[in-house]
Amino acid sequence: MNYPVCVLTMHHCNNNENDFAIRPELFKKALLMALDEGYKFINYAQFKDIVAGRSKASKKSILLTFDDGYFDNYKFAYPILKELNIPAVCFLITDKIRDFKRQDYDFSFKKHKEIDYDKDAEYFLNLDEIRQMQESGLFEFDSHTASHFSCRSDDEAKLREEFSSSLAKIKELFPEKTEFGFCFPKGHFNEFSQRIVKEYYGFAFSVIDGGFCMGDDKFKIRRIDISNNAKSESDYIFRIKKKLFVYSTPFIGKIYSDFRNRSFK
């Protein structure tokens, strides 16, 4: 059986009340729910084997991904993942990586839409935090462009600059890596950018809702958003549980995803 992988995507794990953030306590409850329901969190190497056709996914497989590389991933999510021994992938905006010593661990986190990508360096992971997470064996990192540039653009020179610069930084930071993936910022892409990205990376993630099966288009890998826009904790857990059930079920998940995303080509 060609089982789907449920690739989960999120941005923030902090105590802000907004659609892009999951409170740490709720994040842990969601992970424990998935484990209690028999789901298995796979690491990035295992997922890359599935993408490349070197192995098949087991039933109820999950890959956890974080977009942008925010400091709250380190402060709040990372300790929970260490406690539960759950691996994850983080897609870095590579121009935001700084080698600085963090002075204050208690600053008030801004809401996602209030973050200034040019000025708010402290909201992103620094080099030491990235290294700690990578050396734990739980986290791997890949590219999310250099500057969070929209890949709906038709500016070939700028797209190539974003792809190549980000790839070069990832290679510099992780010289042992031999396979490189990409995540489209905000999930935005078009046929033009998708064609160009193939020259630099082996696969790419979208935000098209759904699971990923071996043999699917590996340059628009579907993911399942687990950001918190629910009315209550119980509603949130129910929604995640339902999404996992639907998208981990062969055939049913594919039909449902295709119907929901019929505007995508």
Describe each PLM feature range:
Residues M1-T65, F71-D72, F76, D155-K265:
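C-terminal active-site subregion of NodB/CE4 polysaccharide deacetylases
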Residues Y70-F71, S147:
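Short, glycine/acidic-enriched loop or turn micro-motifs at the edges of active sites
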Residues Y3, L8-N14, K60-I62, K82-H188, ...:
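Metal-dependent polysaccharide deacetylase catalytic core of the NodB/CE4 family, i.e.
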